[in-house]
Amino acid sequence: MLAIRIERIGELAVVECKGRVVRSEAAFKLREAVTSLRNARIIVLDLSEVGAIEGGGLGMLLYLQRWAYGHKIQFKLFNPTRSVRDRLELVNPIAQLDIATVHEMMELLANAEHRYSLAA
């Protein structure tokens, strides 16, 4: 089972995932969550609490990457667990999935908060 929570800060959306992405239902749930964020400029998928990801989930990440690119949205993965990172490394040379570093994530959050406070 996959639980998803979305945090918005201005044009930044952080999609926090918890559980496993091993069945079609989980992959489709992830797709619905991410594609609902059409007005975001940056989408970060937090994988720190995802215990496993299988073929359908990996395929969905590739789909979401292409979807985001087509909508001029930056799509980044953040903090995948060791088991998820191992699976990602199998497809990453081909897919070029963007995995944000902690420093990059802190910078994204700081910039989003700054822009959000200026808009308020």
Where are these regions (language model features)?
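ABC-family nucleotide-binding domains
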Residues: E54
